[in-house]
């Protein structure tokens, strides 16, 4: 379970979040809906450590947490898939899915394991038709977004 209590965030005199509070229960899908500029992305960037909150509290499984940067969020098991694509179009699908966590065997990149991980993640998402050896930039935008989700899932987060 994740709880947001009275989260506030200001940018140069503009209030982005004004005492936002809500709870997302474990095992459930929670959607944030709102107009452009309502603060949805700001709240997610606070959760993932890209922004710091000005005030308020975030609790995960009843424990207050201080998410100071993206590494702290990752250590807490928080993963995110932004709507903007961030993949490397010149790399393969498998390289994109495991980038930063590349499997190594005997001191060398293990490309077989890399492909295996990518296939497993895509299969979990029902996207076994995506070729892990294809360059990401050759895929449709929707397929690239599926690869972004697979990359997040490969990190085995507790919270997505």
PLM regions and their residue ranges:
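Glycine-rich phosphate-binding loops of nucleotide-dependent enzymes
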Residues: 1-160
């Amino acid at each position: 379970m994740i709880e947001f209590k009275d989260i506030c965030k200001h940018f140069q005199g503009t209030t982005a979040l004004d005492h936002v509070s809500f709870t997302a229960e474990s095992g459930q899908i929670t959607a944030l809906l709102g107009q452009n500029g309502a603060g949805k992305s700001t709240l997610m960037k606070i959760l993932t450590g890209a922004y710091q909150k000005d005030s308020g509290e975030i609790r995960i499984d009843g424990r207050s947490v201080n998410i100071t940067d993206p590494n702290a969020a990752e250590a807490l098991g928080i993963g995110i898939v932004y709507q903007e694509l961030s993949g490397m179009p010149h790399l393969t699908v498998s390289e994109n899915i495991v980038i930063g966590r590349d499997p190594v065997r005997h001191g060398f990149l293990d490309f077989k394991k890399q492909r295996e991980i990518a296939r497993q993640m895509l299969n979990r998402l029902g996207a076994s038709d995506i070729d892990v050896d294809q360059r990401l930039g050759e895929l449709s935008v929707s397929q690239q977004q599926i690869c972004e989700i697979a990359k997040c899932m490969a990190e085995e987060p507790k919270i997505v």
